[in-house]
Amino acid sequence: MKKTFPEDRVNIGVNKITPYQPGKSSDSLNISKEKLIKLASNENPIGPSKLATKAISHIVEEAHRYPDGNGTKLKQKISKLEGVPLDSITLGNGSNDLIEFSARAFLTNGDNALYFKHGFAIYPLAILATGADLRELPVTENYHQDLTSVINFVDKKSKVVFIASPNNPTGSANTFSEIEAMLNDLPNDLIVFLDQAYFEYIEDEQY
């Protein structure tokens, strides 16, 4: 007897998801890796530092051991560098992981989450996987994210707002004062996920 995949058992939100399309590889473009600089993938074209490769080589020697699942030493370093308490730091396997963590932690069926059009493709995928509804916000003619408009799309079912600054792939960014003004407008119980994965590209002092 031939068995079919029980699609009706799959989470309704997951059934709405279309596969994420990552950036094309150098092989698919028929371009050597040395000639390709993938800004959208946030890749470092000059390679890892010698200090990083040296540290990795030492870690390999302990690959048979489970690492500290809490990442205590790394959190201590980040805490000292950024001046934030340890219990305010969460580690993840890249920003995708943290986005999905946040969606699962704060969203469920019947909620909605907001994000801007032309934003990072992972936002709607992470939202849908929880069963929550999408609320896509429009951008201006020059693809700028107008943060003053966010409050107009918020209702009682809104739980999370995802904002990338600078945004990938449009490259638009919001200033510190724009973000601060938006936070003052929004309800105190609304979670704002500020994605600054590409902040190294910004040179504007107002950022």
What are the functions of these language-model segments?
Residues 105-163:
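PLP-dependent aminotransferase-like
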Residues 35, 88, 133-135:
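Conserved beta-strand segments of alpha/beta enzyme cores
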Residues 47-49, 99-100, 123-124, 170-171, ...:
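Glycine/Thr-rich phosphate-binding loops of Rossmann-like dinucleotide-binding domains
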Residues 64, 72-112:
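Phosphate-binding glycine-rich loop
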Residues 141-205:
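Active-site phosphate-binding strand-loop segment of PLP-dependent enzymes
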Residues 2-65:
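N-terminal "arm"/small-domain region of PLP-dependent enzymes with the aminotransferase-like
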Residues 42-45, 95-96, 120, 165-170, ...:
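Short glycine-rich anion-binding loops that position phosphate/pyrophosphate groups of nucleotides
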